[in-house]
Amino acid sequence: GVDLKNLDSSMEKLRETFAEYGLGAKTGVDLPTESQGYTPKEFTFANYLTNAFGQFDNYTPLQLAQYAATVANNGKRVAPHLVEGIYANDKNGGLGDLIEKKETKVLNQVNISEENMKLIKEGFYQVVHGGSGFTTGRTISQGESVPISAKTGTAETLTKKIQQANNT
């Protein structure tokens, strides 16, 4: 439960759980720098509540991709790579010999039961394949050659002091 007397520790615990999936954490991508997203230091109890379902902290597209991949990998969070390896040039300037292969690096395993991970994965699947009005991803399944899943979301922007929400 939420410790109302110590909201800071409650938010910290929530964010630690999110970080297990790569949200608000470095992804481990093979670039010299990366953003960890935006996690405000000051917040209210209302912010804590909305953060619990994804409406307060802001994450990078790469963090969101890593989050989805972590769920797909049954909780195994893997560092993303931009390249498979580093190659030399051949005498004609083309692709030469492999100099360094980029190995898969597992960053962590999410602390979640197999049963609960299965529920999350089923929820992602139902976003595309469900039969209710909440099946917001149905159109992306048209013509699929492999089973796909998706995560719903709401992108919020603030322009000229007018808040806009875009549900996806």
What residues fall within each predicted segment?
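Beta-lactam-recognizing serine transpeptidase/beta-lactamase-like catalytic domain environment
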Residues: 1-168
